[in-house]
């Protein structure tokens, strides 16, 4: 793959925007919030801020001569699973560490932002441009992780800066869309950024298949619940049924029943389930059980990629399901 070199001002703008968005996500937190870990599968907010900065330091060390890391002790705590940089700290115990402190992490975040900004104002090699692009995408991933960790941590006590009124989705008529099979090219073959798991581009054979025109809705999933879906082992994989019993699952995470009505809790507070919204916060096991109950199945990775990205008119894939234009800030 030949690496594409991004224009200097484009990469710098992307980096600055990304760092600003991360800080925006934690802007309304109290200091006591930053170090709390509410479950083994979440991470404290301060860890996310430190980790994305630490990865930027990894990139700096690979692109700048004689680069010295800010702190070896920081590296031990902020490493996630990169064994070449030492033994990672146990994810389930990230919230047990009081050091580095919140103030130290915020100072570290600001320092690394300045260091990378200085570098991005100078000419870069294609390899360096690729690595800094990777670190930007990596931070965007952690923004997503940070949001769902904050929901688990604070629920409707969290006050996002950009929280807007939720638009009620329209009621759509469900239909199955027929997707023709044949040879389909998966993966990436361009000169821009991609993760290594997208390489190499390769051909796969798909049979004809059908896929619904919109994701499973709250209404559809509620039908599964009310039909005893969580009480009938025949819909569940063995490990899934064990999880149902062990964790006492009876509905998606954040759902609760009040009288005869179902509610969910999110950043706007407790509200009635909107029947037309896509169901969220279900596990793989729950998704599989629903599909078996509905007489359907989950799409394969290749099927979903073709259904979501293939454009018949131009005979090629789009970058996003809606086209090639990047998502807006909202």
Spell out what each predicted region is:
Residues 2-34:
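N-terminal regions that are enriched for targeting/export leaders
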Residues 21, 25-28, 55-59, 115, ...:
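Generic, well-ordered alpha-helical scaffold segments in large soluble proteins
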Residues 2-3, 89-99, 122-123, 199-205, ...:
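Short glycine/proline-rich turn/loop motifs
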Residues 135, 139-141, 145, 153-167, ...:
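Functional-site microenvironments in short loops/helix caps that host divalent-cation chemistry
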Residues 13-24, 104-115, 141, 285, ...:
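A non-catalytic, amphipathic alpha-helix used as a structural packing/dimerization or gating element
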Residues 19-31, 86-90, 114-121, 260-267:
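Active-site-adjacent bridging/hinge elements
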């Amino acid at each position: 793959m030949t690496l594409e070199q991004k224009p200097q001002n484009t990469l710098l703008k992307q980096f600055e925007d990304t760092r600003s968005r991360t800080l925006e996500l934690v802007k309304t937190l109290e200091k006591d919030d930053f170090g709390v870990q509410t479950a083994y599968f979440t991470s404290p907010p301060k860890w996310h801020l430190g980790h994305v900065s630490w990865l930027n330091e990894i990139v700096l060390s690979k692109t700048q001569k004689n680069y010295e890391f800010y702190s070896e002790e920081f590296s031990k705590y902020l490493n996630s699973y990169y064994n070449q940089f030492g033994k990672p700290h146990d994810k389930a115990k990230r919230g047990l560490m009081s050091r580095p402190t919140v103030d130290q992490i915020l100072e570290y975040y600001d320092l690394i932002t300045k260091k990378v900004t200085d570098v991005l104002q100078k000419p870069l090699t294609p390899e360096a441009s690729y690595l800094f692009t990777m670190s930007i995408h990596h931070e965007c991933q952690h923004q997503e992780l940070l949001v769902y960790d904050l929901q688990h941590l604070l629920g409707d006590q969290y006050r996002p800066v950009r929280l807007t009124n939720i638009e009620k989705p329209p009621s759509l008529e469900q239909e199955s869309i027929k997707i023709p099979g044949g040879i389909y090219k998966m993966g990436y073959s361009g000169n821009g950024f991609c993760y290594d798991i997208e390489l190499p581009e390769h051909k796969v054979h798909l049979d004809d298949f059908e896929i619904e025109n919109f994701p499973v809705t709250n209404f559809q999933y509620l039908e599964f619940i009310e039909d005893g879906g969580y009480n009938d082992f025949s819909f569940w994989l063995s490990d899934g049924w064990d999880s149902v019993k062990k964790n006492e699952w009876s509905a998606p995470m954040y759902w609760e029943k009040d009288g005869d009505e179902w509610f969910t809790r999110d950043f706007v507070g407790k509200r009635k389930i909107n029947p037309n919204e896509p169901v969220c916060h279900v596990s793989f096991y729950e998704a599989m059980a629903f599909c078996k109950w509905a007489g359907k199945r989950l799409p394969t990775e290749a099927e979903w990629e073709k259904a979501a990205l293939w454009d018949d008119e131009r005979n090629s894939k789009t970058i996003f399901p809606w086209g090639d234009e990047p998502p807006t800030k909202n």
